[in-house]
Amino acid sequence: MLKRCLSPLTLVNQVALIVLLSTAIGLAGMAVSGWLVQGVQGSAHAINKAGSLRMQSYRLLAAVPLSEKDKPLIKEMEQTAFSAELTRAAERDGQLAQLQGLQDYWRNELIPALMRAQNRETVSADVSQFVAGLDQLVSGFDRTTEMRIETVVLVHRVMAVFMALLLVFTIIWLRARLLQPWRQLLAMASAVSHRDFTQRANISGRNEMAMLGTALNNMSAELAESYAVLEQRVQEKTAGLEHKNQILSFLWQANRRLHSRAPLCERLSPVLNGLQNLTLLRDIELRVYDTDDEENHQEFTCQPDMTCDDKGCQLCPRGVLPVGDRGTTLKWRLADSHTQYGILLATLPQGRHLSHDQQQLVDTLVEQLTATLALDRHQERQQQLIVMEERATIARELHDSIAQSLSCMKMQVSCLQMQGDALPESSRELLSQIRNELNASWAQLRELLTTFRLQLTEPGLRPALEASCEEYSAKFGFPVKLDYQLPPRLVPSHQAIHLLQIAREALSNALKHSQASEVVVTVAQNDNQVKLTVQDNGCGVPENAIRSNHYGMIIMRDRAQSLRGDCRVRRRESGGTEVVVTFIPEKTFTDVQGDTHE
């Protein structure tokens, strides 16, 4: 019942009620004790007064017969007997009748007897009777005082029992209502601090502890949910950061790889494979233009190229099937403000989209590819200019030294030949041979100077061949056909000069000797070799064409040997002449091993 009465109260009110109860018990005990003690107050003084009356009685008895000088003693005793303190004490303790009897006896009998007595024996009995009455009065005061003191002790004991019961109740109540719930809350708080949100506080009732336990349970549940959400976000953020780290690492590796000195295929293929692994893009294809002509380009893909010459290369994936669903084709142009270098093509599956990071990755990689291709083309032009300048310098030095010496020797031989019959026959034959050798040397020097002065106005072999075909088309009077099938930048510039000179020499021979109406120049790739073919439908090369003074064929064979290749000149079965040159183009490998295979 007490529990039901206390349950609507809050913990603070319940504690206040317990404090009020203990205070009330204490105050009640103190009030009763005070009241009882107040009743005892004055009893000792009254007993002292009564005792003094006995002493004064014996003094008067000793003074018999009384005289005038003893009247102050009588007056003092009368004041004591009729004092207000003694009257109040007797009235409080129920001894008023006894006191009044003693007072009447004193006034009516004892005083007159003392005044008449001439000796002590006559009034000794009266004094003894008065003292006996005083003893009874004092005994009454003592009994009343002892009773009051016993009552105070009893009240104190009762109050102590009540206080002990209240203390026991308070301890039990504190353990049930405060200590145990508090331990549960502390245990739950400790569990929450250690990220354990599974514990719950089971606190009954409708007090503050129950409300706090319910609030902590709700908070723990919400924290568990929040932590789950936060952990999921952390995992997502971690995955995002790892992906960004992979992107940054890929961009750094790609930038390092693209700016190495390895061949273009070894630089681009790993980059395209890495891009396909980091994004949703599939069937990635990079087309690198030889010039601004989009039709003439070199393709780099992530799919294995069955026509690739290097079958042992692991740069392209093997056994990878293309995606069945083509999806959406995306394009990124590799161009700057001056030149278009190529285009990047890729397929995005249906219903998928590139994320912001993936889009930035592709854009950054496109910028890197553009910068790499621009730098390669610039370096190619610079290398070509350097080669042209070196050749022009060599041509000037040849012209200023050997050409002048040969011209001087020809004039000296001409002077000797002008002497005619003055010279012996053997000398004239020797001079004729010397002049023929000088003419041959002069012709070879002219061809050499022509070669060194040959200019490649555009980077790459194809523009130079196209320009040469246009030049000889004007000389032939009909178009010289060019069938160019090589990928861009397959032939280095120093080899392209020799190949171009061989083609020009073959066209020059056809112009001088073939009387052809059709000339076709074909440049193709056969496995890992480059094959140059110049065909005409003219009269054909004679069987004894290979002789010492046929300098055109000698020049073509010498240049083919410079290419570490082979040059064959033969008569076509259908008529005409065919010049075939085959060689393996050189590859520029990186000076430091490992630049492209981190």
Swiss-Prot record:
UniProt-listed InterPro entries: HAMP_dom, HATPase_C_sf, His_kinase_dom, NarX-like_N, NarX-like_N_sf, Sensor_HK_TwoCompSys, Sig_transdc_His_kin_NarX/NarQ, Sig_transdc_His_kin_sub3_dim/P
Enzyme class, spelled out: transferase
Sequence ranges assigned to domain HAMP in this UniProt record: 176-228
One Pfam family recorded for the sequence: HisKA_3
Transmembrane segments: 15-37, 152-174
Keyword entries, A-Z: ATP-binding, Cell inner membrane, Cell membrane, Kinase, Membrane, Nitrate assimilation, Nucleotide-binding, Phosphoprotein, Transferase, Transmembrane, Transmembrane helix, Two-component regulatory system
Organism: Escherichia coli (strain K12)
Keyword Zinc-finger: no
Function field: Acts as a sensor for nitrate/nitrite and transduces signal of nitrate availability to the NarL protein and of both nitrate/nitrite to the NarP protein. NarX probably activates NarL and NarP by phosphorylation in the presence of nitrate. NarX also plays a negative role in controlling NarL activity, probably through dephosphorylation in the absence of nitrate.
Membrane-topology annotation of the record: Multi-pass membrane protein
Reaction(s) catalysed (UniProt annotation): ATP + protein L-histidine = ADP + protein N-phospho-L-histidine
Annotated GO biological process: cellular response to nitrate; cellular response to nitrite; DNA damage response; nitrate assimilation; signal transduction
Matches recorded under PANTHER family: NITRATE/NITRITE SENSOR PROTEIN NARX-RELATED, NITRATE_NITRITE SENSOR PROTEIN NARX
Record protein name field: Nitrate/nitrite sensor protein NarX
Recorded name of the encoding gene: narX
GO molecular function, one term: phosphorelay sensor kinase activity
All ranges on the Periplasmic side of the membrane: 38-151
Keyword Protein biosynthesis in annotation: no
